[in-house]
């Protein structure tokens, strides 16, 4: 059977749905606090959570928006979000299974869009951003949050390698400049950007994804062989825990 990228993503995340709903890294953080402020100021009527994962952005937006649509490629992830929303009494969250690059929605059907820790899995980065622009009303706000590459090849190669070994559905963590350029090409005008450093506890990070012992050892081997510069940038600890760079870009749909 042919294993497409979409099937690889669904296989990778379907069995891990509960782990992402329960994940502390995904359920809290400075980025969610910043996003909450933007959502409150926007007071959306219909908001889209693009690549919902464990649904934490949807649960946040449901407190302010009249309606929220949570989209994810994984049917199991969507089912977990629907169950959690029901358990929390959030009746204004609808779930839809679809790829970011081919959204089953009308043009301009949403007045707010948020996308958190999803774009690095997309087969077509620009295609997903173009779809986000298409389904969002002109002049409305979109917020994109993701791990980003620090840029220099020395750091970028290490980052992409450990990400891919841990999660074989990983495509790419983009640089800040790649994000800004892709948003501009896709119809967005960036209006603000914030960055954070996020610590990844190695045992939790690998367990959440169900990374095999063989692959976890491979990551530790890469870390042990890393240059002093790489070790310093990612603040690699003795147990393999390390720091990631995270960005949040607020943009207007042109």
Language-model-detected regions and their locations in the chain:
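A conserved beta-strand element that flanks and buttresses the S-adenosyl-L-methionine
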Residues: 114
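A short glycine-rich, Lys/Arg-flanked "PGG" loop and its adjoining helix->strand segment in the class I
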Residues: 126-138
């Amino acid at each position: 059977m042919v294993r497409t990228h979409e099937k690889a993503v669904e296989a990778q995340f379907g069995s891990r749905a509960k782990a992402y709903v329960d994940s502390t890294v995904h359920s809290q953080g400075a980025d969610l606090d910043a996003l909450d402020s933007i959502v409150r100021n926007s007071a959306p009527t219909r908001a889209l959570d693009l690549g919902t994962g464990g649904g934490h952005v949807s649960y946040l937006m449901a407190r302010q928006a009249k309606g929220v649509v949570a989209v994810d490629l994984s049917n199991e992830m969507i089912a977990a979000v629907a169950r959690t929303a029901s358990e929390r009494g959030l009746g204004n969250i609808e779930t839809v299974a679809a790829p970011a690059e081919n959204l089953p929605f009308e043009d301009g059907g949403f007045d707010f869009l948020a996308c958190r820790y999803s774009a690095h899995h997309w087969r077509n980065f620009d295609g997903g951003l173009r779809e986000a622009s298409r389904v969002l009303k002109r002049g409305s706000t979109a917020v994109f949050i993701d791990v980003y590459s620090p840029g220099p090849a020395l750091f970028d190669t290490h980052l992409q390698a450990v990400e891919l070994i841990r999660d074989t559905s990983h495509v790419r963590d983009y640089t800040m400049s790649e994000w800004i350029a892709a948003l501009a090409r896709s119809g967005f005008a960036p209006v603000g950007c914030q960055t954070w450093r996020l610590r990844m506890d190695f045992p939790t990070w690998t367990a959440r994804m169900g990374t095999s012992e063989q692959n976890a050892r491979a990551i530790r081997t890469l870390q042990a062989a890393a240059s002093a510069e790489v070790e310093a940038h990612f603040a690699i600890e003795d147990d393999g825990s390390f720091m990631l760079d995270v960005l949040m870009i607020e943009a207007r749909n042109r």
